[in-house]
Amino acid sequence: MVAVENPIHRAYLLKIVGEEGLRIVEAMPEEEVTDEHLAEITGISLNTVRKSLYLLYEHRLAIYRRKRDPESGWLTYLWKICPESLDSALEAEVRKLINKLNARLRYEKDHVFYACVNGCARFVFEEASENNFTCPFCQGSLEYMENSTIVEVIEERIKELSAALCS
């Protein structure tokens, strides 16, 4: 059985495979196991077990081996969880998030924004200008919006995530 005690690992697995998938992970024995056996011991439908295993495989958190039955010719998939890969998978997720935040930071720094006085939406200067500084949703006026707070928050988040990667 694979115990997932680390709250960060637990949250990550929940994000990937949900509650039932987490139950499947925790029910996995140390040795290889078939998806049918997992469905049997967890009481979770075979389709859900397979979906969860494939999601784990896509994130490199599970591996499988195919074995052909010599009599029937059918393939049997034997699955195994790779809990040692959780940290590297989380690290990859953090790197992706940092890249997205850097792209958002560039966007925020490269544009001037105008916001609807009624809170409908926020527009870049070009869009606001095309609409004569009038909100296309409510016809309210669009006023200049200072985004330095947004920039600071993004920069701080990037700094925190980068520090977490280094530790």
UniProtKB/Swiss-Prot annotation:
Top-level taxon of the source organism: Archaea
A Gene Ontology biological process term: regulation of DNA-templated transcription
Keywords: DNA-binding, Transcription, Transcription regulation
Entry-linked SUPFAM superfamilies: Winged helix' DNA-binding domain
Coiled-coil intervals: none
SMART domains for the chain: TFIIE
Pfam families: TFIIE_alpha
The keyword Transcription is assigned to this record: yes
UniProt GO molecular function: DNA binding
PROSITE patterns documented for this protein: HTH_TFE_IIE
HAMAP family linked: TFE_arch
Protein name, entry field: Transcription factor E
Phylogenetic lineage: Archaea, Methanobacteriati, Methanobacteriota, Stenosarchaea group, Methanomicrobia
Gene encoding the protein: tfe
